[in-house]
Amino acid sequence: MNFLYNNSDYSSTSHTMKSPSAYNQFPKLQASNSTAGNNNTATTATAAAAAASASASASVTPQLISPTTLTTPQNKYKRGGLDNTLPKIETTRKNRPDDGNSITPSNSINSGTTKLTLPPRRVWVKKPQTNNPTTVLCYVNDIIDDLKVAVVNKYPNTIGRYEDAADLLVKIDLNNIRVPVSPSVNRVSQRTPFDNCIILEPDQNVWQILDNYFPNGMAMHDALIIETPTFKPDHQMLTPITANMNNNSNTFIPFQERQSSIGNNNNNNSNVNNNNKAQAVKHPQPMQPNNTRVGLHKSYAMNRSSFSTNNNPVPSIIKDRSVSPSNLGVSRNSPVSHKRSYSNPVSSPNSVATQANNPSAVLLLPRNFSLANNNSNQASQSSGGTPAKKVLSEDGSKSVNDKTEEVVSSKLKPNDNNKSYQAKQQEQQTAEQSENGFSETSASPEAVHNSKAAPLPLTKSSTTATTTSSNSISNNNNTSSKGKPSQSKLKAANDPTPTDIVLPSISVLVVEDNAINQAILGAFLRKRKIHYQIAKNGQEAIDKWKKGGFHLVLMDIQLPVKSGIEATKEIRHLEKLNRIGVFHENEIGKNVIINEEDRLTSNTFRSPVIIVALTASSNSSVDKTNALTAGCNDYLTKPVNLVWLQNKITEWGCMQALIDFDGWKDKNRRLNKA
C-alpha cells in the first residue's frame, strides 16, 4: 500500500500539471488506503479517471516535457540532478493573432523563405514589329534598368552590339491590357502621342508593374516592347500642328490628317525657299543604310519655338542652311525615296552669300566651273539685259547657261594666246602624278571640257585643282579682254621655282635588279626633271660610276654578280686611292701605284658620292650595320615613301652644292645655256 501511495505522491509532484478536478481525487485515494479490504478495483478506476482528466487538460495548458520519461524519486535528491535536465517549453500559435513585431518564419533572418530568395519571375519581351517574343528572368528587387541589362544579354547581336542598355526604351501596349490600371502608375509613366503605349521609367519595380498591369499572369501576347533609339523617317517628325499640342494632351490625330499637314508644311517651305531665291545645284544624294543607328540626342529634334501659327512661317534654320535638293520641285509621289542626308548638302554659287554666317558649310564645284561667269551673268541681268534661262540636266551634275555656254567653251579651247593656261594644266597634272608614283599622259583641254563634270570630294588635291582651274579661267578672261597676255605673267609662269633650281643639278645612279622598282623610281625622277641612270647589278654600277657625274647612288644590297655591299666597298676604295675627299696623310701612302683602270680624273670627281642603301630584307638591323660599315651614307627600307624620298633628294642636292659649289655652278650655267 505504501508503494501505491508513494507512486501517487510522485505522480502528484511530477512534471505533469493537473487540473483541480484531478486533485479532488486524492482524498478518495487516501480513504481507500486506510480501509482493510484493499479495494484494488476502486483504486485502479480512480487512477484511470485521473489520467483521462490529465490528457484532456494537456490540449489547453502548456506541457512540461521531462527529458526522461521515467525517473525514480531519488533523482531529485542527487546533486545537480535537476540542474542538468532543464525542461523545454513549447507553445502553439494556432489561436493567437499575428502581430508585426513577432518573429515568424516568413520574416525571420534565418528563414529560408525570405523575399530575397524568392524564385525569379519570367517577363516576356519582344522587339517592335516582330512576332517572336522571348523571356528574361527578373528578381523581386529588379527595376526596369536591370530589365534593360537582361534584354541586352538576351539580344547580344542585334541590340547589344549597337546600343547601350541605358538607351533602350521599354513600353507596354495598352491594347493588350484588359484590367483597369491604377492612376498612380499612369502618372509615373510617359504616354507617347500617337500610339497607345506607355514608356516605363528606369526606376520602376518590375514585379510591381507585373502585379498592376498583369494581375492574372503575363502571357506571350502581353510581351513588353523593347525599342532602340533609331532615327525616325520624315513622316514621323513633329509638324507645326503636333508641335503646338500640350504635353499633357493625349488627343489622337488620324494618319491622313498628319500626312496632309506635312505636305502643306513642305509646300510652305518650298515657297519660302523660292521667295529667298536660294537656287541649289542638284546632286545625287548617297542613300543611308537601313541599319544605321543614330542616337536620340543626335536626331533632328524639331524645336517647338521654331514653328509659328502664322500663315507665312520663316524658320531661321532655312536661312542658315543651304537648300535641300528635295525642295527643287521633286514630286512626293516619285518612286525614288530620298532619305535625309545629315551632312551639309551641296549648294549653288548663288547661295554662297547666305552661307557666310555658317562656317560649317561646304561648297563643292565641278572642275571646270568658275564663279566669274556667274558674277558676269548677274551683272548683265542687273544692267537690264534679258536673263538667260537656267537649265538643270537630268543627272543634276552641272548647270549650263544658254548664253554663256559658247563663251566658256571658247575660253577652254587651247589657242596661241593661252599658253599660260596650258602650262598650269601641265603643272597640275604633274603634281597629281607625283603622288601616285606613275607617269601618265596629260589629257587635252578638249577632253576635259567634253567629259561630264562630277562632284569631287573635298580633299587637298581637289581643292588645289579647283583653285587652279578657277584662277586659270579668270586669267583667260583677262587675256581675251585685253587681246594679249601680259609679259609679266608669262615670265612668272616660266620662271623656275627654287626646288627646280636645286634638283636638276643632281645626277642619280639607281642600282636595282627588279624591273618594277626600276620603273617606279624612273618615273619618280623623270617627273622631277632629275637626270638618272639605271644599273642592274653591282659590277655595272661600278662601271657607270667610273664615268663620273653622279652625286647620289641608290644602291640595292641584294644584287646579282656583285652585291651592293661589295660594290660600295670598291667605290670607297677607288675614292681613297684617287684622293677624292678629305683624308689624313697617314691613311694613304705616298708611293702608292694606281692602275690605269682605277685612275679617276680630278675634274670629274670633286667630292665623294652619296651612297644610300636599299633593302627589303626582314633582317634589316644586320643589313643596316653592314651597309654603314661598308661606307654607305644612309639606309632605307623598302617600300620607300616617295614624298620622303623627294625631301631627302633635295637635302642631298643641297649638300652637294655646298661641297662642290664651283662644279654645281658651272653645271647649272651649262643647263641655262642649253
Swiss-Prot record:
Family matches, as SMART domains: REC
Modified sites of kind 4-aspartylphosphate: D556
InterPro entries: CheY-like_superfamily, Sig_transdc_resp-reg_receiver
Location of region: Disordered: 66-115, 259-354, 372-497
Pfam families, A to Z: Response_reg
Induction / repression: Expression is detected as early as 1 hour after infection of reconstituted human esophageal tissue and increases thereafter up to 48 hours postinfection.
Domain Response regulatory: 507-653
UniProt entry tagged with the keyword Phosphoprotein: yes
Keyword Phosphoprotein appears in the UniProt entry: yes
Transmembrane stretches, start-end: none
GO biological processes: cellular response to heat; cellular response to neutral pH; cellular response to oxidative stress; cellular response to starvation; filamentous growth; filamentous growth of a population of unicellular organisms; filamentous growth of a population of unicellular organisms in response to biotic stimulus; filamentous growth of a population of unicellular organisms in response to neutral pH
Compositional bias ranges of the Low complexity kind: 264-276, 343-352, 372-383, 422-433, 459-481
Start-end of Polar residues biased regions: 66-75, 101-115, 302-314, 323-336, 434-444
Record note on disruption phenotype: Leads to flocculation, attenuated virulence towards reconstituted human esophageal tissue, and to hypersensitivity to fluconazole and voriconazole.
Bias type Basic and acidic residues, positions: 90-99, 391-416
Keywords: Phosphoprotein, Stress response, Two-component regulatory system, Virulence
PANTHER family per UniProt: HYBRID SIGNAL TRANSDUCTION HISTIDINE KINASE J
Role played: Final receptor of the SLN1-YPD1-SSK1 two-component regulatory system, which controls activity of the HOG1 pathway in response to oxidative stress and probably also to the osmolarity of the extracellular environment. Involved in cell wall biosynthesis, hyphal growth, and virulence. Regulates the expression of CHK1, as well as of a subset of genes whose functions are associated with cell wall biosynthesis and adaptation to oxidative stress. Provides at least partial adaptive functions for the survival following encounter with human neutrophils.
Similarity-based family: Belongs to the SSK1 family.
Protein name as it appears in the record: Oxidative stress response two-component system protein SSK1
Organism: Candida albicans (strain SC5314 / ATCC MYA-2876) (Yeast)
